[in-house]
């Protein structure tokens, strides 16, 4: 009997010890989130992406390529040359190509048609160098012109619906030696890696926050990342084959995220740790 009482007392003591830190942990979590939010506000003041956007606007207006033409007649979906609000409505179906295109793939179409810059030249260029660096700067300019706009991706066309379903399948597809998918990190509420919260991209709130804040400047490596680069890095982390730049794979994933985030607000370029 004495042993039983002692065991029960010990169990209660251990239980109390285990339960007590829960409240402290909750307090610590709230304080941590508040501190991170304050940090993000501070680093967002004077986003370095603004410098790239200024260069991108100049590149948009400057004649270039074999045809020595600017991109000022590029139709991003709202009419030739209209940049304001265009990124908030991408990806979208374009009748002139018969395809669904995101921002980068549409820009490659314009570069090829207007300037004579071959699409493959952009695809083959290393990240943040050559034609891809030019692309990054132009992307920074265009998404800046949609900052504060509502995410408004038109899903009415059948090809957009097809892309959404393809993107959804890819999002949940497990691959690589670690056997995980996009959903492993971004398919549940309340997940994080170290200090980084992971938005649930299957729900509106998470998709709006995730999609609506990319492209972004990454403070940790002092680099501007487009959505194409961000998605490629996800594949790299899966230790699987990275998709071709501007391929249907990345466009489909973008359609899935953007459609889930419809109605949210574009805060682009974002700024990340």
From Swiss-Prot:
- Compartments (UniProt record): Periplasm
Q: Name one GO molecular function term.
A: iron ion binding
**Free-text description of this protein's post-translational modifications in UniProt:** Cysteine persulfide at Cys-234.
Q: Which cofactor does it need?
A: heme
This enzyme catalyses: L-cysteinyl-[SoxY protein] + thiosulfate + 2 Fe(III)-[cytochrome c] = S-sulfosulfanyl-L-cysteinyl-[SoxY protein] + 2 Fe(II)-[cytochrome c] + 2 H(+); S-sulfanyl-L-cysteinyl-[SoxY protein] + thiosulfate + 2 Fe(III)-[cytochrome c] = S-(2-sulfodisulfanyl)-L-cysteinyl-[SoxY protein] + 2 Fe(II)-[cytochrome c] + 2 H(+)
Q: Which UniProt keywords apply?
A: Disulfide bond, Electron transport, Heme, Iron, Metal-binding, Periplasm, Signal, Transferase, Transport
Q: List, alphabetically, the Gene3D superfamilies matched.
A: Cytochrome c-like domain
UniProt cross-references to InterPro entries, sorted A to Z: Cyt_c-like_dom, Cyt_c-like_dom_sf, SoxA
Catalytic residues per the record? 234
**Cofactor note, please?**
Binds 1 heme group per subunit.
Q: Where is the Cytochrome c domain?
A: 162-273
The protein's enzyme class: transferase
Binding positions for heme?
A: 182, 186, 234
Induction comment from the UniProt entry of this chain: By thiosulfate.
Could you give a single Gene Ontology term from the biological process aspect? sulfur oxidation
Q: Where does substrate bind?
A: 230
**Cysteine disulfide partners in this protein:** 74-110
Keyword match Transport? yes
Its annotated function is as follows: C-type monoheme cytochrome, which is part of the SoxAX cytochrome complex involved in sulfur oxidation. The SoxAX complex catalyzes the formation of a heterodisulfide bond between the conserved cysteine residue on a sulfur carrier SoxYZ complex subunit SoxY and thiosulfate or other inorganic sulfur substrates. This leads to the liberation of two electrons, which may be transferred from the SoxAX complex to another cytochrome c that then channels them into the respiratory electron transport chain. Some electrons may be used for reductive CO(2) fixation.
Quaternary structure note: Heterodimer of SoxA and SoxX.
What does the similarity note say?
Belongs to the SoxA family.
Protein's UniProt name: L-cysteine S-thiosulfotransferase subunit SoxA
């Amino acid at each position: 009997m004495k042993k039983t009482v002692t065991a029960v007392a010990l169990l209660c003591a251990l239980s109390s010890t285990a339960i007590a830190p829960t409240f402290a942990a909750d307090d610590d979590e709230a304080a941590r989130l508040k501190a991170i939010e304050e940090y993000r506000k501070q680093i967002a003041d004077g986003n370095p992406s603004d410098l790239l956007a200024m260069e991108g606007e100049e590149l948009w207006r400057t004649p270039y390529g074999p045809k020595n033409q600017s991109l000022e007649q590029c139709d991003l979906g709202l009419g030739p040359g209209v940049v304001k609000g265009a990124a908030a409505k991408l990806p979208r179906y374009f009748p002139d190509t018969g395809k669904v295109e995101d921002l980068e793939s549409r820009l490659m179409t314009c570069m090829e048609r207007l300037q004579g810059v071959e699409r493959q030249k952009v695809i083959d260029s290393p990240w943040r160098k050559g034609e891809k660096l030019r692309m990054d700067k132009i992307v920074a300019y265009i998404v800046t012109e949609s900052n504060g706009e509502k995410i408004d991706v038109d899903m009415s066309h059948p090809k957009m619906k097809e892309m959404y379903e393809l993107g959804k399948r890819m999002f949940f597809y497990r691959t690589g030696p670690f056997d995980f998918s996009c959903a492993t990190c971004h398919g549940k509420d309340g997940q994080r890696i170290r200090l980084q919260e992971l938005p649930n991209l299957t729900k509106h709130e998470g998709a709006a926050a995730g999609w609506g804040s990319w492209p972004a400047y990454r403070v940790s490596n002092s680099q501007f990342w487009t959505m194409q680069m961000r998605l490629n890095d996800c594949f790299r982390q899966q230790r699987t084959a990275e998709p071709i730049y501007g391929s249907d794979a990345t466009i489909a994933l973008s359609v899935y995220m953007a459609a889930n985030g419809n109605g949210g607000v574009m805060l682009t370029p974002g700024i990340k740790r």
